[in-house]
Regions:
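Long, compositionally biased
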Residues: 80, 86-90, 168
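Catalytic core of Fe(II)/2-oxoglutarate
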Residues: 182-188, 192-286
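Short, solvent-exposed beta-strand-terminating loops
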Residues: 60-61, 65-83, 186
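Catalytic core of non-heme Fe(II) oxygenases with the double-stranded beta-helix
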Residues: 109-117, 126-221
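Fe(II)/2-oxoglutarate
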Residues: 1-41, 269-286
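Short, contiguous, helix-prone interaction/anchoring segments in small proteins
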Residues: 35-54, 58
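Hydrophobic residues positioned within well-ordered beta-strands of beta-sheet architectures
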Residues: 47, 168-170, 243-245
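Signature of the catalytic double-stranded beta-helix
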Residues: 51-53, 58-66, 70, 89-143
């Protein structure tokens, strides 16, 4: 399909099914209500077929173009992306490290002509996410490397159990691998006041009854409270990479990632990461 047919967010989003551009309509009220109900249940909402089927090949094409620019990392990490602390017991989840093989295309690869950037900067899109979350303070992430990114997962790669840095993450399934790549999560496992390390350890030990899984297909949009819900992606099977677009929003205006985590995820940091270090909305580990 000729990609020149796609110029803005309305060319990608199925606005008939999800009338983001009609906030005063009954249809809009329903999709907000439905999304809010899913989030209230377990902190996870999936909007099936959010992207028009005809537009998906263009998003895949764009992902194929930038995938070689992804920062690939092969290391061991814990759920908090923090350093080991030998003063803690060996069973503490902060001392439980797992192999991580992953790749992220930084946000500065997505200019205004790209589909992901067009969707992210579409004001009705931001307003809908804000309404679905019932957020009073809601801003686009100010991180120039991380506001709009693509996660590229190749054969054998995955993402071990972890918490997100920002409170609300919005992801778009663009392409699945031939197998694997299952999203698993333990909803609302911690709070801003309580890390609940034992509950985290139970998930890591595979003894927790809290873990759920969902199958996302290309075109599905997911709203997820990953700051408080432990989650992972199981290893991808087959030679076709898994592409997921990630749109990040926060409650603190001007917030960016920490220098340590930014370096881990994107292989580099910018002056803004050092300038704004410590600007956070809570006191959690990561």
């Amino acid at each position: 399909m000729d990609s020149t047919a796609f110029a803005g967010a309305s060319d990608y989003i199925d606005l008939n099914r999800y009338p983001l551009d009609r906030p005063g309509s009954a249809g809009y009220a329903k999709i907000v209500s439905d999304a809010a109900a899913q989030l209230a249940d377990d902190g996870c909402c999936v909007l099936k077929g959010f992207i028009r089927r005809q537009a998906l090949p263009d998003l895949v094409r764009q992902a194929d173009l930038v995938a070689p620019r992804a920062h690939r990392s092969f290391n061991r990490t814990n759920a908090y992306f923090s350093e080991d602390d030998p003063d803690l017991p060996a069973t503490d989840p902060r001392r439980r490290f797992y192999d991580r093989s992953n790749a992220f295309v930084p946000a500065d690869n997505f200019g205004p002509e790209t589909g992901l950037r067009a969707i992210y900067e579409f004001d009705p899109f931001q307003l809908f996410i804000k309404h679905a979350l019932g957020a009073d303070r809601f801003f686009r992430y100010a991180d120039p490397l991380a506001d709009v990114i693509i996660n590229v997962v190749e054969e054998g790669g995955g993402f071990p159990w972890h918490f997100d840095t920002n409170n609300f993450t919005v992801t778009l399934a663009i392409q699945n691998g031939h197998g694997g790549g299952v999203f698993e999560y333990a909803p609302n496992l911690r709070t801003p006041e309580d890390e609940r390390f034992q509950a985290v350890a139970d998930v890591l030990d595979e003894t927790s009854q809290a873990v759920r899984s969902i199958d996302l297909v290309p075109g599905d949009l997911q709203i997820f409270k990953g700051r408080y819900s432990l989650h992972r992606v199981t290893p991808v099977v087959g030679t076709q990479p898994r592409y997921v677009g990630i749109f990040s929003f926060v409650e603190t205006e001007g917030m960016v990632g920490s220098p340590e985590r930014t370096k881990q995820l994107y292989g580099r940091v910018l002056p803004i990461h050092h300038e704004r270090a410590g600007l956070r909305s809570d006191r959690l580990k990561d």
